[in-house]
């Protein structure tokens, strides 16, 4: 179904991102397993994919950093020729009550969850238009609609992804 497709999954070293990466590979895509913090966790995801007969490689990029994202996306396109599927899944939490949350923690969540999604979408949009195909899938959360105590920053970031 996805044979010959190049898929990028951000935040794919564990959790939902790992499950997404494995499913993309199961359907035949070559998966770029993006991670920021844990190379070991990304390697585990890649190993699970390859042991099941799929193809994947782990690539580090902090999606909150626009320059890192630009290098990340440009390197993938340079090496593989295109990106067919982008799944924006990278996300962090810095939970605290609104009156106690620091601006640094608020910004960290917005920068990763919302701006990281923007960075990667902006960078793949033009190449996808040129190739006249491509899919962008943004993972959000019900918290972006209903909120959650202690997660004002997370709720704002996920509401932004929903649009």
List where the protein language model places each region.
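Conserved glycine-rich Rossmann-like NAD(P)H-binding loop of the short-chain dehydrogenase/reductase
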Residues: 27-44
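The beta1-alpha1 cofactor-binding region of Rossmann-like NAD(H)/NADP(H)-dependent oxidoreductases
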Residues: 39, 60-72, 103
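Substrate-binding pocket helix/loop in short-chain dehydrogenase/reductase
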Residues: 97-98, 102-110, 136
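Active-site "substrate specificity/gating" loop of NAD(P)-dependent dehydrogenases
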Residues: 101, 147-151
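Active-site helix of classical SDR
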Residues: 121, 157
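Residue(s) in the substrate-gating loop at a strand-loop-helix junction
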Residues: 141
């Amino acid at each position: 179904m996805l044979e010959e497709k190049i898929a990028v999954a951000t935040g794919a070293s564990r959790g939902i991102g790992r499950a997404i990466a494995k499913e993309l590979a199961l359907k035949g895509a070559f998966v770029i397993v993006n991670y920021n913090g844990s190379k070991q966790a990304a390697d585990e995801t890649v190993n699970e994919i390859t042991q099941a007969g799929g193809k994947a490689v782990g690539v580090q990029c902090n999606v909150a950093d626009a320059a890192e994202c630009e290098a990340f996306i440009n390197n993938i396109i340079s090496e593989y020729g295109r990106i067919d599927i982008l799944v924006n899944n990278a996300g962090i939490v810095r939970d605290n009550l609104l009156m106690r949350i620091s601006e640094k923690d608020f910004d960290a969540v917005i920068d990763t969850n919302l701006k990281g999604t923007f960075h990667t979408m902006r960078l793949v949009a033009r190449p996808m238009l040129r190739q006249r195909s491509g899919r962008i899938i943004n993972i959000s959360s019900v918290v972006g609609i209903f909120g959650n105590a202690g997660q004002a920053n997370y709720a704002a970031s996920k509401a932004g992804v929903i649009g």
